[in-house]
Swiss-Prot record:
This is Ribosomal RNA large subunit methyltransferase E. It holds the Pfam family FtsJ. Belongs to the class I-like SAM-binding methyltransferase superfamily. RNA methyltransferase RlmE family. The active site is at 164 (proton acceptor). One of its GO terms (cellular component) is cytoplasm. Its EC number is 2.1.1.166. The keyword Lyase does not apply. GO terms for molecular function: rRNA (uridine-2'-O-)-methyltransferase activity. Specifically methylates the uridine in position 2552 of 23S rRNA at the 2'-O position of the ribose in the fully assembled 50S ribosomal subunit. Keywords: Cytoplasm, Methyltransferase, rRNA processing, S-adenosyl-L-methionine, Transferase. The gene is rlmE. It is found in: Cytoplasm.
Amino acid sequence: MTGKKRSASSSRWLQEHFSDKYVQQAQKKGLRSRAWFKLDEIQQSDKIFKPGMTVVDLGAAPGGWSQYVVTQIGGAGRIIACDLLPMDPIVGVDFLQGDFRDELVMKALLERVGDSKVQVVMSDMAPNMSGTPAVDIPRAMYLVELALEMCRDVLAPGGSFVVKVFQGEGFDEYLREIRSLFTKVKVRKPDSSRARSREVYIVATGRKL
């Protein structure tokens, strides 16, 4: 791609981003990202979060999802969050900066969870996108498989899993895998998710024993 094409593409993205009504609302409300609205839509539909819950937030930065969940679980709840990128502190959120693909980071995250009964694991993780689906989709699928592995390790029976997945090769198999582990599984495309994006959110509730 030439510099001129890249510049035109970047300009279009910036124009779309700043004219996006959810970006504008997020700025007005002082929210960390437009992702707040995606999780709010999921909560309105599926009633995932309740006061006092312990929640694991993967791919947490800049903090939109954690910021939302704090309002739902209250002071008695707890969020253990992780991201490769830094995140400004949020009261009630225990943040670990590191690469979730790294075994040592995974171990440190499990240590922070400790003996807590985790009621929700949520993942908004995504790889750096190259724009080539043949490269991007396998990278994204690897991350969501790791998130599901975290569910197997820490999620309490009856717990819930919310995960961003990009539709493409491996999606159907992944969905079948989740259906085998949870009693109820929905695929959501929130209004606040950009229409041209391949992303959808799998909302799985009732982890089987």
